[in-house]
Amino acid sequence: RTRSEGARYFIPTWDEWLKAAHYDPNKANNDGTTGGWWLYSNGSDSPFVPGPPGELVNGQLATANFGFQNAGDLSCWSVPLGSYAGVQSPWGLLDTAGMTQEWTEEALGFIDVGYEVRRIEGSSWGDNPAVLLADSVSFGAGSAFPTLNFASNGFRIASVVPGSGTLISVAVGVMLV
């Protein structure tokens, strides 16, 4: 159950997901070098501010879709793509924090006993703000059975950029209900 040879579109591996969300080839480091990892997928080492898009939370503009259920006419399940203005990964990915935890291609253990668990990354709309660390590159990732439906899990589709081996995301997580 791995990527088909020559696939044009696919669910990214965990490594591909992390790099697309956290790695910045232009990050200026203290030692004068460039290229490195941001702690959070918003291109910084500052955590996300959970809440509805466009709202102030403790004096800061909300930057991630988790920690709220409803805000006026807006439901946490239907926040439009890109609603958190200016919040994106160094590669331009939108909404890597909140909305849905995203499946990756990586299978974990238990395969030889007839079932597998897949790695998921990021946070979802239903997460408590106390789990902010889950969006940190240093936290690791969760896992779940792909045969179970969770409204908090979705996926991101990636593609190979024509003429290079670099991956980009072309579609954002779709909630599996």
Predicted features, each with a name:
Residues 1-135:
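Functional-site microenvironments in short loops/helix caps that host divalent-cation chemistry
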Residues 12, 64, 146, 162-164:
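Proline-rich low-complexity regions
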Residues 81, 161-162:
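Hydrophobic aliphatic residue packing
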Residues 150-160:
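Short, structured beta-strand segments at or near domain termini in extracellular proteins/domains
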Residues 162-177:
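A short, hydrophobic C-terminal helix/tail in secreted or cell-surface proteins
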